[in-house]
Amino acid sequence: MFTEITPEQAGISSRSVAKFIQKMEQRGLYNHSVLLARGDRIFCEGYWAPYNADSLNRLYSQTKSFEGIAICLLADEGKLSLDDRIVDHFPEKIHREIPAHLSRQTIRHMLNMQTCLTDPAWFADKSAVDRTEYYLNRIPPFRTPGLVWQYDSAGSQVLTSLVEKLSGMRLLDYLKEKLFNAMGTFSTARILKTRNGDSWGDSALLCTLRDVASFGWLLMNGGKYGDTQLIPEALVQEAIAKQVDCDETGFGEAFHADGYGYQIWHFLDGFAFVGMGGQLTVAFPQRDLLFSITGDNQGYPGAYSLILACLQDFILDELQDSPLPENPEAFAELQSLLSSLQLKHIPGPTESAYQNTLNGVRYICEENRMDISEFSFRFDSEDTGVFCYRNAQGYKELPFGLGKNVFGKFPQWGYSDEYGGLSGGDDFFYDCAASAAWREEQKLVLKVQIIDKYLGNFFAIFSFRDGGACVHISKTAEDFLHEYYGWINARAE
């Protein structure tokens, strides 16, 4: 559905777009893909290899915006009212006397995230098989709904269950029938499942970059595709408008500064879908500008603000209402930059005189929470190595690059696959990228990026002196990599 134009045709210089990409790189952001469009005309599209145009990106909480529109479509069909009490739609799942606050909670409250509940850590409670049942029975309500905004991801999952109950279809199948089949998008997309088989609608849509951008464009275009009004325009305007204030800090942080609609963030003069780790789709209807980006910046303080600051400085401030004269040389330079993008590796020196001393030495670990009992390093060449270690699962090897990523399978098994919160088995492993740098002569820092249906990362800092080693591993990942977080003291054998 998209066409491609030069930045100059879009009203911005190719050099400004190149500076935008370069500044994000300089800021150390771990991005996977980026797209900029004026309406349905793309003027910048890039992928950090191994990601490409066909890659399915985990959107995390951007998924909520899809579920929110699905709820609105069901309301338009007359299958629900936004002012319905949520408890009236799930009598079969309620096994307690309904608390007063919960009895007053409506679908609209949930769309706006003004619920009566706190967001539960359902991952940790293995008995939380049916998240809707868990939400309605196990979480104590503590405030009147409709008064205070607080992020409630679990409530979004309940709304997903409602979509599937009332439509009789999977969330994505329903949206395909209503929207995406007509647009020719989301043909390869899918949604992971919760433990009981419901679509994981608050977190787990996987789709291409153009897919998610097309959804942003549809809402920016008032729900109209070609001559067909796929979503009533009034409904779109209601969904993307500021329904409630959501500034919890008083500092006006990027997405808490302006407001919240129906599972859609409102800020500046536009709206956004926002997902963990740097998944963003931002639309500015007044300027006909669309921006989508994916990545894994979990654990990077201020990543969203950095991305938006770069967008403001190099795109929004430079964008003109009329086309600019073509600049073939600058455009060629931009295309060269975009085609050369590689998944970021950890920066730092790739050589140390200590490397030969460390090579092959076995370290015996003191008792630690990660159950790593021993480790060693093997350096196969000047720019590659292997982290060898033994933990509760047995002996493992993790190849890594120096000054580059090495791609492979992360050796820990038992993490979730199609069903969130359930093990994928002992023969299922996530794709990963690993790199290392010598930050000091006797300090090696290893970074591992999980680049699969689930995104996560960890840093491991290995400091050596006088036959001893101190190791600090710090992970950022939702419900996995728990075995890679803590401290180790070790001695050379």
Model-derived features: positions:
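Active-site-proximal loop and beta-strand segments within enzyme catalytic domains
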Residues: 2-6, 10-11, 15-25, 52-63, ...
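Alpha-helical scaffold elements that line and support the substrate/ligand-binding pocket
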Residues: 13, 40, 60-79, 85, ...
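A short, well-structured edge-of-sheet supersecondary motif
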Residues: 16-52, 82, 288
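Active-site helix/loop module of the DD-peptidase/beta-lactamase fold
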Residues: 77-115, 166-203, 207
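Active-site-proximal binding-pocket segments
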Residues: 182-240
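Active-site Gly/Thr loop motif
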Residues: 189, 236-294
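Structured C-terminal helix/loop/strand segments within mature extracytoplasmic catalytic/sensor domains
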Residues: 275-345
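Peripheral terminal and inter-domain segments
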Residues: 328-493
